[in-house]
Regions:
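Phosphate/diphosphate ligand-binding glycine-rich loop within oxidoreductases
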Residues: 39-141
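Structural motif corresponding to alpha-helix initiation and N-cap regions
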Residues: 34, 82-86, 199
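Hydrophobic beta-strand scaffold positions of dinucleotide-using enzymes
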Residues: 21, 99, 210-211
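Glycine-rich phosphate/diphosphate-binding loop of Rossmann-like nucleotide-binding domains
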Residues: 50-63, 143-211
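Positively charged, low-complexity intrinsically disordered leader regions
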Residues: 1-57
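Residue-level preference for short coil/turn positions at secondary-structure junctions
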Residues: 3, 37, 41-42, 116, ...
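Conserved beta-strand segments of alpha/beta enzyme cores
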Residues: 6, 71, 119, 175, ...
Length: 211
């Protein structure tokens, strides 16, 4: 289980914690539109690590950190490189207050979080994409007023977005149903290693539709 200060997967956290984050995100979205974002990261040193391709969410992180008053530095490191994860964690602890990292392997990211004392935030792995799903949930919460009884249909093959929606179903009072053509590939639930012990009937993966 991740530390409460880490944000690695949605189902590492309690429902009330996630709902508090979502409501705060709605407030920050309004502040962004009004160009009056609180300086909540004033003086905070943030390492942004892009250990996997892509530019949109890491650019959004960098912009958000700077708009909130933080100092953002892109650290060109790789969790799969020659340096031991424990050694990287020590350097990050010495230099930064928070690390935001986009990396392929969730297992490696968890090892970094275990070795480091600073908070580790998952910007994306190939198994999950919790901040992306949080953004979607914040929009739904703003429009709907609550998440109770929410049923989400995910028309997608196995991937990190589906993985995070499955995490959301385990943590919140929502149901997630995967719908996909049989020609795609086996549902995520067949890979038990990717499922949290918290997963239950709230997540139905593998509903096929070949119409």
């Amino acid at each position: 289980m991740a530390s409460v200060t880490d944000f690695l997967a949605l189902d590492d956290h309690r429902a009330d914690t996630l709902e508090s984050i979502l409501r705060r995100a709605i407030g920050y979205a309004q502040a962004w539109r009004e160009r009056q974002v609180p300086q909540a990261l004033q003086g905070v040193r943030v390492a942004l690590v892009v250990d996997d391709g892509g530019w949109r969410n890491t650019t959004a992180f960098e912009l958000g950190i700077k708009v909130m008053g933080g100092l953002c530095v892109r650290a060109p490191i790789s969790l799969a490189g020659n340096e031991a994860v424990g050694d990287l964690a020590q350097y990050l602890d010495n230099w930064f207050d928070i690390v935001v990292i986009r990396t392929p392997d969730l297992g490696q990211l968890r090892r970094l979080a275990e070795a480091a004392t600073l908070p580790v935030i998952n910007a994306r792995t190939r198994s999950n994409h919790p901040c992306e799903t949080l953004g979607d949930l914040a929009y739904v919460l703003q429009q709907r007023g609550n998440l109770s009884g929410l049923r989400v249909g995910v028309v997608a093959p196995d991937g990190n977005i589906l993985g995070s929606w499955a995490e959301a179903a385990a943590a919140l009072s929502i149901e997630v149903v995967q719908i996909y053509p049989e020609r795609w590939h086996p549902p995520l639930c067949e890979d038990r290693a990717l499922l949290s012990d918290n997963r239950d009937g709230s997540t139905r993966l593998g509903g096929r539709c070949d119409h």
